[in-house]
């Protein structure tokens, strides 16, 4: 039993609230326990210049933390070029591109903004999970008004953290767990069981191949539960593989 009462393979309380922005094409607030992220999707009718003439579109993302999303105030990253900020922004963009057939999207762009309102660990995984909902809702709206000819969603995408502490695998780390953990990993998966991204670091004690595979299994369990949460707020957009 963990300090917050969860089982080792149990997610925090997950809540996704869709359509929270009056102006964005798609939006959602996602909560992983005390971590809360606002995700919005903005449609641009033109692809980036380097894609013009290819027939393909683009999904990109920007991530940021509000100054009082943490215990003490953090300075705004006005340039959006800070190492961690840029790394997570790119992770979110890569992850969400795996959800879409970019050729079907056409020469258009959707920008996903993920703003952390409250941080208690797992902000990047919450951003991917909520960002997918905002993206899917935007695509649904754009298809309904014939801005895009077909709905280009091809996968659900969600993300979760897994840690290894004194030989015990833990799912969905909060801040205290993440700070004390021996091995910290982030997994991004599709509903077809494919891995989009695997990030892992042994902070103190190296992990074995067997432990890695077990962490992958626990991560897949968590991601599959997240797919159900995503589907529950999106309506009939795209059916989860195997559901």
UniProtKB/Swiss-Prot annotation:
CDD domains assigned to the protein according to its UniProt record, in alphabetical order: RNase_PH_bact
Enzyme type, top EC level: transferase
Catalyzed chemical reaction(s): tRNA(n+1) + phosphate = tRNA(n) + a ribonucleoside 5'-diphosphate
Gene Ontology MF annotations: 3'-5'-RNA exonuclease activity; tRNA binding; tRNA nucleotidyltransferase activity
Binding site for phosphate: 84, 122-124
InterPro entries in UniProt: ExoRNase_PH_dom1, ExoRNase_PH_dom2, ExoRNase_PH_dom2_sf, PNPase/RNase_PH_dom_sf, Ribosomal_Su5_D2-typ_SF, RNase_PH, RNase_PH_bac-type, RNase_PH_CS
Keywords: Nucleotidyltransferase, RNA-binding, rRNA processing, Transferase, tRNA processing, tRNA-binding
Transmembrane segments annotated in the record for this chain: none
GO biological process: rRNA catabolic process; rRNA processing; tRNA processing
Pfam families, per database record: RNase_PH, RNase_PH_C
EC number of the protein: 2.7.7.56
Intrachain disulfide bonds: none
Entry similarity comment: Belongs to the RNase PH family.
Quaternary assembly: Homohexameric ring arranged as a trimer of dimers.
HAMAP family assigned to the protein according to its UniProt record, in alphabetical order: RNase_PH
Function: Phosphorolytic 3'-5' exoribonuclease that plays an important role in tRNA 3'-end maturation. Removes nucleotide residues following the 3'-CCA terminus of tRNAs; can also add nucleotides to the ends of RNA molecules by using nucleoside diphosphates as substrates, but this may not be physiologically important. Probably plays a role in initiation of 16S rRNA degradation (leading to ribosome degradation) during starvation.
Name the record gives this protein: Ribonuclease PH
